[in-house]
Amino acid sequence: MSVAQNTFPLSELMISLTTALDMTEGQPPEHCIRCCWIGMHIGMQLELSEPELHDLFFTLLLKDAGCSSNAARICELYATDDLTFKRRYKTVGTSLSSVINFIVKNTGSEQSWTERILTTIDILKNGNDYAQELIQTRCTRGADVARELRFSEAVAQGIHSLDEHWNGQGRPEQRKGEAIPLFSRIALLAQVFDVFQMEHSIEEALQEIMARSGVWFDPKLVEVVEQLVENPRFLSGLKATDISQRVMNLPPAQAHLPLDDAYLECIVTAFGKIVDAKSPYTAGHSERVAVYTDLIARQLAISDADRIWLRRAALLHDIGKLGVSNAILDKPGKLDEAEWRAVQAHAAYTEQILYKLSPFKTLARMAGAHHEKLDGTGYPRGVNGDEISLMTRIITTADIFDALSAERPYRAAMPIDKALAIMEENLHTAIDPECFAALKKALNLLPDEYTQLPHSSDKT
């Protein structure tokens, strides 16, 4: 297995990974990148220092790093599709009537009319507490991700205070005015401007931020945006099809910060946690699949260098699930045809996301094919065994084992021996026999934290 060397800049990796963050917010592609374009031009107009522009750059790209952590709770509280809910919520006006109208229209879409009325009443009664909880969860997790990615505390705080408002009526801490970190003020302004210019027009986006000046936004920053929209180069860049490259050409992105293996591992692990945070039923899934993958690979005498990259592919194999609604992922009953197609799409999303990352181009197909089957009945391409690499077969075996042995929305965790028995029934069709044999041997070598998996003989 040949992979690219770690000579690419940190900015390239982060820009590419924003595709996944856009998905989890239900936003059009390149939302975070456009926000970075907008926010960086604000920062340059303010003549921020080089270190400040560097931190602002990554605050803007990673502003949504914690958003997967409240997806399941949104579905639970509002009984609706989290992706659609999040996308529509960002276009709600500031008036009470706009908020109430949004709640009535978007609550209970997965329920009967009677249940919907009861849920809506609950939201109208307790919505303030729920909103605080959801934003607190997202902000705290987003800041933690920034720290895990080794960014400065200024970046972490910029993400944590994204939803604070100039008038002190924001969340999670009701900070007011200049007590709100500058990076947060810029990021929220850039976010709202992009959402409205994509949904409507530049003119309407400008009207919206001007209407919120002194309420949501720092008036001085709004004035900067008013000046920017008079700049043809700013507007053409915002609408350009190559905006990713244009953002890559900004000064902070040009600072060459090569990644060593330890830092790359840190980044991959952090994004694996972002994926797993989307559902309570996927908590720890990516890490466990990576552990099982590595143990199987050891049994098959895969080289140390290839095992490192194989483990990274395993950590990110489900990153495409950020683009699937929790209303589907956490559904306790049988999926209908449309829902099943949505679930299947996650494998293709994984490949698309990873292919954008220079070091992962070779791994993209490998990770995205983890639901292919040897008999050709898998997805996304329906290829047969001859076209499925050994590396993919290893990840597939690890993924199936964890899917069976972990708790699911529709059943409790399955004992190891029962999971292995089911897997054995699917040898030569879905599961590679050599990989399965390696898994059985590898289970005796599990790290201590994985030795508590249930067995049929265990008392319940």
From Swiss-Prot:
Entry annotation: catalytic residues: 321
Molecular-function GO term, any one: cyclic-nucleotide phosphodiesterase activity
Entry superkingdom: Bacteria
Biological process (GO), any one: cyclic nucleotide catabolic process
Domain HD: residue ranges: 28-189
Keywords: Hydrolase, Manganese, Metal-binding
Residues annotated as binding a divalent metal cation 1: 317-318, 399
Top EC group: hydrolase
Keyword Manganese: yes
pH effects: Optimum pH is 10.0.
Expression induction: Expression is up-regulated by 3'3'-cGAMP production (at both mRNA and protein levels).
Quaternary context: Monomer.
Described purpose of this protein according to its UniProt entry: Phosphodiesterase (PDE) that catalyzes the hydrolysis of 3'3'-cyclic GMP-AMP (3'3'-cGAMP), leading to linear 5'-pApG. Counteracts the function of the 3'3'-cGAMP synthase DncV, and is involved in the modulation of intracellular 3'3'-cGAMP levels. Enhances bacterial chemotaxis and inhibits intestinal colonization in vivo. Thus exerts a crucial role in regulating bacterial infectivity through catalyzing 3'3'-cGAMP degradation. Is specific for 3'3'-cGAMP since it cannot degrade other cGAMP linkage isomers (3'2'-, 2'3'-, and 2'2'-cGAMPs); is also able to hydrolyze c-di-GMP but not c-di-AMP.
Domain text: Consists of two tandem domains of about 15% identity and similar three-dimensional topology that interact to form a pseudo-dimeric structure. The N-terminal domain (residues 1-258) plays an important regulatory role in facilitating the catalytic function of the C-terminal domain (residues 259-460). The N-terminal domain alone does not show any activity. The C-terminal domain alone is much less active comparing to the full-length protein. The full-length protein is 13 times more active than the C-terminal domain alone.
Protein name: 3'3'-cGAMP-specific phosphodiesterase 3
Lineage of origin: Bacteria, Pseudomonadati, Pseudomonadota, Gammaproteobacteria, Vibrionales
